[in-house]
């Protein structure tokens, strides 16, 4: 083998990423989304169109970035065992950071709920706040999420065992369960008697449940991508890192929702 040909092969298992515009483009698009969201909430921007445009740019850059990642793992073979271990480690740290974010919101909630001062009427929920009843839509959403955890596990085991029919059917059911959850959560928000500006209760309630809602929207996109990849035979029984991280992501969001339901809906009422 000639030296020139031999030099094309790596002597290590790690992926040297080629120059990509997506990290810097995504950073600026997220900055634009944050600024337009803050300006819209404070009334500096009089309409919602700049916010929607920023969100569209973020979704577009994410789509293009995910396209490159799919090409690297499926067609170029860049995701070796060492690379997959690194991805799993990075995703684990991401989950830890998400748990810490929600922990800070629970801290803020209990800080006010366990010792309400005179400005809150010395009661929790504060005077004038009609809390969402835990036996209505929140209970239905809890059942839906628990069911989705079961169906995604069924799908995952089907993929591991090489049963394509079970894997696809379980993933399809999971996708529609999560879509139903998102719609029910939207209906709940549309019918609440308070908003995010109604004191500490409204702020913490919508910050906690709203952040979880945004994660569920992201989960819907991830499930859709995995369904498309599974239909196109991108995933195998031994190589499905994206699908596996999506499964873990769903289970983590299930646990966080159970904590939100117990603390914000059941105990908080």
UniProtKB/Swiss-Prot annotation:
- BP GO terms, sorted: mitochondrial electron transport, cytochrome c to oxygen
Q: Which reaction does it catalyse?
A: 4 Fe(II)-[cytochrome c] + O2 + 8 H(+)(in) = 4 Fe(III)-[cytochrome c] + 2 H2O + 4 H(+)(out)
E.C. numbers? 7.1.1.9
Q: Which UniProt keywords apply?
A: Membrane, Mitochondrion, Mitochondrion inner membrane, Translocase, Transmembrane, Transmembrane helix
Q: What class of enzyme is it?
A: translocase
SUPFAM superfamilies from the UniProt entry:
Cytochrome c oxidase subunit III-like
What subcellular locations does the record give?
Answer: Mitochondrion inner membrane
Regarding the membrane, this protein is recorded as: Multi-pass membrane protein
This protein's GO cellular component annotations are: mitochondrial inner membrane; mitochondrion; respiratory chain complex IV
Question: Superkingdom of the source?
Answer: Eukaryota
Q: Name the Gene Ontology molecular function terms of this record.
A: cytochrome-c oxidase activity; ubiquinone binding
InterPro entries, from UniProt? Cyt_c/ubiquinol_Oxase_su3, Cyt_c_oxase_su3_dom, Cyt_c_oxidase-like_su3, Cyt_c_oxidase_su3-like_sf, Cyt_c_oxidase_su3_a-hlx
Which family is this protein grouped under? Answer: Belongs to the cytochrome c oxidase subunit 3 family.
Q: How does it assemble?
A: Component of the cytochrome c oxidase (complex IV, CIV), a multisubunit enzyme composed of a catalytic core of 3 subunits and several supernumerary subunits. The complex exists as a monomer or a dimer and forms supercomplexes (SCs) in the inner mitochondrial membrane with ubiquinol-cytochrome c oxidoreductase (cytochrome b-c1 complex, complex III, CIII).
- Write out the function statement from the record: Component of the cytochrome c oxidase, the last enzyme in the mitochondrial electron transport chain which drives oxidative phosphorylation. The respiratory chain contains 3 multisubunit complexes succinate dehydrogenase (complex II, CII), ubiquinol-cytochrome c oxidoreductase (cytochrome b-c1 complex, complex III, CIII) and cytochrome c oxidase (complex IV, CIV), that cooperate to transfer electrons derived from NADH and succinate to molecular oxygen, creating an electrochemical gradient over the inner membrane that drives transmembrane transport and the ATP synthase.
UniProt cross-references to PANTHER family, sorted A to Z = CYTOCHROME C OXIDASE SUBUNIT 3, CYTOCHROME C OXIDASE SUBUNIT III
Which protein are we looking at? Answer: Cytochrome c oxidase subunit 3
Q: Which organism is it from?
A: Eremothecium gossypii (strain ATCC 10895 / CBS 109.51 / FGSC 9923 / NRRL Y-1056) (Yeast)
């Amino acid at each position: 083998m000639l030296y020139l040909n031999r030099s094309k092969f790596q002597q290590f298992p790690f992926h040297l990423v080629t120059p990509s515009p997506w990290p810097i483009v995504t950073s600026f698009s997220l900055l634009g989304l944050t600024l337009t969201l803050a300006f819209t909430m404070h009334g500096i921007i009089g309409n919602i169109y700049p916010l929607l445009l920023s969100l569209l740019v973020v979704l577009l850059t994410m789509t293009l970035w995910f396209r490159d990642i799919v090409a690297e793992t499926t067609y170029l073979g860049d995701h070796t065992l060492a690379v997959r271990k690194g991805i799993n480690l990075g995703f684990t740290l991401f989950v830890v950071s998400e748990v810490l974010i929600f922990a800070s919101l629970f801290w803020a909630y209990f800080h006010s709920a366990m010792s309400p001062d005179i400005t809150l009427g010395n009661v929790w929920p504060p005077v004038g706040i009609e809390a969402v009843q835990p036996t209505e839509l929140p209970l239905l959403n809890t059942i839906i999420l628990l069911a989705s955890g079961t169906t995604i596990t069924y799908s995952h085991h089907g993929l591991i065992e090489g049963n394509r029919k079970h894997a696809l059917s379980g993933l399809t059911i999971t996708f529609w369960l999560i879509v139903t959850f998102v719609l029910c959560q939207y209906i709940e928000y549309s019918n609440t008697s308070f908003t995010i500006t109604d004191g500490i209760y409204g702020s913490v309630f919508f910050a906690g449940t709203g952040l979880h809602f945004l994660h569920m929207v992201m989960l819907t996109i991830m499930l859709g991508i995995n369904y498309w990849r599974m239909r196109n035979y991108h995933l195998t029984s031994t190589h499905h890192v994206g699908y596996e991280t999506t499964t873990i992501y769903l289970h983590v969001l299930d646990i966080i929702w159970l904590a939100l339901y117990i603390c914000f809906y059941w105990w908080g009422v």
